[in-house]
């Protein structure tokens, strides 16, 4: 098995020796493709400094990897990972039972992306199976620039009605642009993929 890849639209191209643990300094999610190759995001623990504007560390040198158009390199940014971001407070840790919680998710791409909300704000629907019987229904999250960095973008609903034992699922619905845009930063014009259904769905259960 190759240690990394460069196939268009593959979710498994990133260097495989990088751990998937979010707490690791070399978390795979912080790796993405540029036209220099596979790099590690600047400003992360792996970079050795907190300067997010510094040049990223090149892990695997591959000229033209990201591409300069929709027909070169990786062609278009592809989603490689998605997750719920769980906090440690009463309204962010999914343990409020029957009450309101913040729902925050992070979508990771294999390339740097640029989100433009001038025409509208991208959204993402989180399914709720309503196991509690409270009738809270699905939740629509909106793009949140705070916490979004380079190849990772976040969607949030700050006050969502949830019931104890409700199961929330990420991945059943794709990103909706609502006249906003999510573009490949490498060329400035290629649309990033909005498809989440190619990955395994991620679920979280509300508790008390």
Task: Give names to the regions the model predicted.
Residues 1-208:
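Non-catalytic beta-sheet/beta-sandwich ligand-binding modules that flank or precede catalytic cores
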């Amino acid at each position: 098995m190759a240690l990394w890849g460069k196939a268009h639209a593959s979710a498994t191209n990133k260097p495989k020796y990088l751990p998937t643990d979010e707490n690791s300094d070399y978390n795979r999610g912080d790796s993405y493709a540029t036209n220099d190759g596979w790099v590690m995001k600047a400003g992360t623990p792996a970079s050795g400094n907190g300067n997010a504007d510094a040049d990223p560390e090149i892990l695997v040198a591959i000229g033209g990897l990201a591409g300069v158009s929709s027909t070169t390199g990786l062609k278009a940014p592809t989603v490689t990972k998605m997750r719920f971001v769980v906090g440690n407070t009463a309204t962010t840790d999914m343990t409020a039972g029957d009450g309101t919680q913040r729902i925050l998710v992070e979508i990771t791409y294999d390339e740097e992306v640029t989100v433009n909300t001038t025409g509208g704000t991208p959204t993402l629907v989180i399914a709720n199976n309503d196991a509690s019987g409270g009738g809270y229904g699905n939740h629509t999250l909106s793009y949140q620039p705070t916490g979004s960095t380079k190849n990772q973008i976040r969607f949030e609903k700050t006050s969502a009605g949830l019931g104890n034992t409700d199961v929330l699922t990420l991945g059943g619905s794709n990103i909706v642009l609502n006249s906003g845009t999510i573009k490949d930063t490498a060329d400035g014009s290629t649309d990033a993929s909005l498809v989440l259904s190619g990955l395994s769905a991620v679920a979280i259960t509300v508790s008390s």
